[in-house]
Regions:
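N-terminal, active-site-proximal structural segment of metallo-dependent hydrolase catalytic domains
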Residues: 1-47, 51, 57-63, 78
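Active-site-proximal beta-strand elements of phosphoester/diester hydrolases
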Residues: 1-9, 98-110, 142
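Active-site beta-strand/loop signature of hydrolases that rely on acidic residues for catalysis
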Residues: 7, 23-41, 101, 130-151, ...
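Metal-dependent phosphoesterases centered on the DNase I-like endonuclease/exonuclease/phosphatase
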Residues: 30, 51, 122-211, 215
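Structured beta-strand-rich core segments of catalytic domains in phosphoester-bond hydrolases
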Residues: 37, 43-109
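Conserved beta strand-loop-helix elements of the APE1-like EEP
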Residues: 60-75, 204-226
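Active-site beta-strand termini and strand-to-loop segments that position acidic
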Residues: 70, 94-97, 221-222, 247-251
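Surface-exposed cleft-lining segments at the edges of enzyme active sites
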Residues: 81-82, 107-123, 158-162
Length: 251
C-alpha cells in the first residue's frame, strides 16, 4: 500500500500548480493533505476512484485536513474528542481492517512561541489518543507535525534552537511519542541520512540552497515496522513550501 502525505499550503493554490497531475503520477492508495484552507463545497475538482473526507477549520481559509482514499474506510472520525481541539480541522482518523490512519496538521507554536503552551498540551492529548487507538489495532500517523526532531532533521540547528518547531520542549514531546511504541519510518530506514528535508522557507532561496527542515512524517506503531517497505521524501515535487512524504507499507 502506498500512502502520501503533503502539506499543500492552500489546496486551491496547489490545484493551479499541478496537484491533479501529481495525484495521477503518484498513484497512491491514500493521499493525506494538511493546510487545505478549503471547505468541501469549494472542492470543485474531479479525482476519480477516491473517496474524499474533509475536516475544515471554523475560520475560513485556515488550517484544514483531507484524506483521499481508494479503499473505503470502515469508519471516519474527525478531531479526537477534546473540545478545545475541535475548531481548527486538524485531525482525520480513518479506520481500515488492518490499521487506523490518523492524518494530522499539528499546531505551530507561532512567533515568539506565543502558542507553545497550547502546542505542548496538544502533544500530550494526541499522544494519549494515538496510544488508545494502538491498543485496538496498529496506527499509521502522518502529516505536518511541525517539529524537526533531531539536529539531523534541520539544516541550521544552532540559530533555530528557540524557534517554533525546534524548541527543546517540542522535540521532547516527539521523543516521548516515539518512546510510547511508535516508529519514525524515515529514520528507521535511514538513520544517518543528511540533507533530507520536507519544508523550506519561501525566504532566502531556502529551497534552492536546501536549507530545510524535516517536519512531515509517517509514524507507525512499533509492530508495523517490519512491514515498512520504503519511506521517502519527494523533494522534487513543487506546488507548496512543503513537499510530499511517502510510505510504502506491506498491509
Amino acid at each position: 500500500m502506498k500512502l502520501v502525505s503533503w502539506n499543500v499550503n492552500g489546496l486551491r493554490a496547489c490545484l493551479g500548480k499541478g496537484f491533479l497531475d501529481f495525484c495521477a503520477v503518484a498513484d497512491a492508495d491514500i493521499i493525506c493533505l494538511q493546510e487545505t484552507k478549503m471547505r468541501p463545497e469549494q472542492a470543485e475538482f474531479d479525482l476519480p476512484g477516491y473517496h474524499r473526507y474533509w475536516n475544515s477549520a471554523d475560520k475560513a481559509g485556515y488550517s484544514g485536513t483531507a484524506v483521499f482514499t481508494r479503499r473505503q474506510p470502515l469508519s471516519v472520525t474527525y478531531d479526537f474528542g477534546i473540545d478545545e481541539h475541535r475548531h481548527e480541522g486538524r485531525v482525520i482518523t480513518a479506520e481500515y481492517p488492518e490499521f487506523y490512519l490518523v492524518c494530522c496538521y499539528t499546531p505551530n507554536s507561532k512567533d515568539q512561541l506565543a502558542r507553545l503552551d497550547y502546542r505542548l498540551a496538544w502533544e500530550d492529548d494526541i499522544r494519549d489518543y494515538l496510544c488508545e487507538l494502538d491498543e485496538k489495532k496498529p496506527v499509521v500517523y502522518c502529516g505536518d507535525l511541525n517539529v524537526a526532531h533531531q539536529e539531523i532533521d534541520i539544516k541550521n540547528p544552532g540559530p533555530n534552537r528557540r524557534n517554533p518547531g525546534f524548541t527543546d520542549e517540542e522535540r521532547e514531546k516527539m521523543t516521548k511519542l516515539l518512546s510510547s511504541g511508535f516508529v519514525d519510518t524515515f529514520r528507521y530506514l535511514y538513520p544517518d541520512k543528511t540533507g533530507a528535508y520536507s519544508w523550506w522557507s519561501y525566504r532566502f532561496n531556502a529551497r534552492k540552497n536546501n536549507a530545510g527542515w524535516r517536519i512531515d512524517y509517517f509514524i507507525v506503531s512499533e509492530r508495523l515496522k517490519d512491514k515498512i517497505r520504503n519511506a521517502d521524501i519527494w523533494s522534487e515535487v513543487l506546488g507548496s513550501d512543503h513537499c510530499p512524504v511517502v510510505l510504502d507499507l506491506d498491509v
